[in-house]
Amino acid sequence: MAATPYGKVSTPEAYDFACFEGALRERIGDAFDVLQSAQVTIMGCGGLGSNIAVFLARCGVGHLHLIDFDHVEASNLNRQQYRVCDLGRPKTEALADLLHSINPFIDTKADQVEVTDDNLRDLLEGADVICEAFDSPAAKAMLVNGARLHFPEVPLVSGIGMAGNGPANVIRTRRISRNFWVCGDGVTDVNVVGTLFAPRVAVCAAHQATIIMRLLLGLADEKLDG
């Protein structure tokens, strides 16, 4: 394959082959097509959600629905995938731009809204996997309850317990019930520990992105994945 000019990718096909298709087809057969057609809805675009979105974009997931009501603040820069030039922008907008800088041909939908019981069902419509990445325990509970009520057949992946600077190896992926996985140490709450560090948040986000990928590819295993 010819060298790519600096800062340019000529076609979607060239990008897909260079980044994903050759390796994925060789290793997992039709996985590339599965990932390209998949939609993951990410609820919350902070430390977990922004990292998860970047991981999935780099793995070739074709459709990402980004949902968050907030704007980028300076306090976000220590652990979230935003830059100084993003300060003041809606997180969904800034994250979508970042994803398109990684993969110009990814399909993103950005909703800058606060998730409530009233709009939850409409926001989750069409998702192949639902990813919970909220900060607030109340918002997490509302999403989990609503998703299990309205879309019990859609896998839900949640993150709980990644605060502080404890060991990374206690962060795990656990299958809580049918179609419901939780990633984290299940203990460390930022309201108790008081700090969030980029490496530990990213470890939890990587766990979430990994089980999402395994679910999309039909590889999730009850014994191996909690």
What are these regions (language model features)?
Residues 92-127, 134-137:
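A structured beta-alpha segment of the ubiquitous adenosine-cofactor-binding alpha/beta core
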Residues 1-40:
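N-terminal charged helix/coil linker that caps or initiates catalytic domains
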Residues 2-14, 123-129, 133-226:
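Glycine-rich phosphate/adenylate-binding loop
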Residues 42-45, 66:
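Hydrophobic Val/Ile/Leu positions in short beta-strands of Rossmann-like dinucleotide-binding domains
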Residues 58-63:
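Conserved S-adenosyl-L-methionine
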Residues 68-102:
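Glycine-rich phosphate-binding loop and adjoining beta1-alpha1-beta2 segment
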Residues 48-49:
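Hydrophobic/small residue at the entry helix of a nucleotide-binding pocket
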